[in-house]
Structure formats: structure tokens, C-alpha cells
Amino acid sequence: MEEAILVPCVLGLLLLPILAMLMALCVHCHRLPGSYDSTSSDSLYPRGIQFKRPHTVAPWPPAYPPVTSYPPLSQPDLLPIPRSPQPLGGSHRTPSSRRDSDGANSVASYENEGASGIRGAQAGWGVWGPSWTRLTPVSLPPEPACEDADEDEDDYHNPGYLVVLPDSTPATSTAAPSAPALSTPGIRDSAFSMESIDDYVNVPESGESAEASLDGSREYVNVSQELHPGAAKTEPAALSSQEAEEVEEEGAPDYENLQELN
């Protein structure tokens, strides 16, 4: 009988701490419901992943400050502006400046004929509706030519440039045509010698000076034909044109040595 009583007592003593722990856990869970939710979420997802709330973006301030409406200011009384007197019948005509601009833009302008047409048009609009009016094209006066470009050309004078006039009439020269200039000095010398060969001849000097020369050659002096007529007799006939060309090509001297006949 004693063993049957001791066994349930021992089991009851072992279950008491377990029941106490369960009661404590239940009371703690009822007091902290938020902690329970967090523990449940942690148990579902691994601890390495952290969930954060979405970042709320603050609204941008407006680029322009808000416009505050103010009540309109009281406008002062406007005085009527005096107008210049206009000629009769000129109210329905377009001004000259507008006509000029219309003419420049190639737009035809029209005007109504007579004041009766205007009255009829006004009456038509007020009573029966729009009425047709007769329009006639107005011929504008031609615009004056622009002379600014011509005036600028006349006023512009540049000293750095020369004004070249067209050769309308060729210049007539009264002077005789000059002889063609010779290009080389040798030809000029030969031509001069051909011209002067008739004026001068070479005659030997005195016998003493001829004997005194070392090489035995005689010296000659240019003497005019008029001063020495005897030498002119011994001068050979004038060379022909063909012989003169040969002399020029060979580079012969410009004078001839004539010896006095013994």
C-alpha cells in the first residue's frame, strides 16, 4: 500500500516544475504580443536578412514661391487725349504710313466709296445682317528710288586707290617710231661701227713711231675722211649687206687698217 501511494507522489513532484514553467510562459506571452510577432517572423526567415520599411521621400519644395494675389489698385481717372483735326472724309481712309507699308508688302488696299456705303454697312449689321459693300483698289504712288547707295559712292574717296578710266580713244603719237632696241651689246656695237665706218678711216702714223715699235707692227690713228682725202681714195668699196652680216657674226673689229702704198 505504501508503494502505491509513493509512486503518484513522486510523479506529481516531477510534474510541478514543468507546470510552473508552462504557466510562466503563458503569462509572458499574454503580456508581450509584439515580441511574439517578432519571434514568429524571425523563426520564419533567416537572421541574415533584414527587412526595413520603405523610405518615404519628402516632397520637393516648389521652384517658384507661391504667388499671392493682391487686390487691383484703383486706377486714376484718365483724361481724354486731344486729337488733331482731320479733314472731312478722311476717317475711312488708311493713313499714308500704312499705305506705304502695304505697298512694300505688295498687298492691295481698298477703300469704301462714299459715306453712304458705310452707313448702309452699319445699318445692315445692326438690323438685317451683314451687307455687301463695293470695294475698289487704290493705286499707290510709286516709291522714290533709293539714292543712299549713289550718295555713298560719291562721298567715298580712298586716297590709296587710283581711278582707272577706260581707253575710249587710243592715244595718237606724232613722234616717228623708234628703232627696235638691240638686245645684246655686241650687236649694238657692230651697228654703231657700221654707221661710223664711213666717217673715219685708219692711217699709219709717222715712220719714226712705226720703227720704234717692238713687234714691228705699225700703229694706226683714226682720222676723218675730210681731213685725210688721200686715205679715202685707197678705201675699198662699201661692203655689201651679206658681207656686213658675216663680219658681225665673226666678231671682226669695228675699223679697217689701211696702209699707205709705198
Curated annotation (Swiss-Prot):
The modification Phosphoserine is found at S40, S41, S43, S84, S101, S106, S109, S224, S240, S241. The modification Phosphothreonine is found at T39. The gene is LAT. Engagement of killer inhibitory receptors (KIR) disrupts the interaction of PLCG1 with LAT and blocks target cell-induced activation of PLC, maybe by inducing the dephosphorylation of LAT. It is a single-pass type III membrane protein. This is Linker for activation of T-cells family member 1. Coiled coil: none annotated. Changing C26A: Reduces palmitoylation; abolishes localization to lipid rafts. It comes from Homo sapiens.
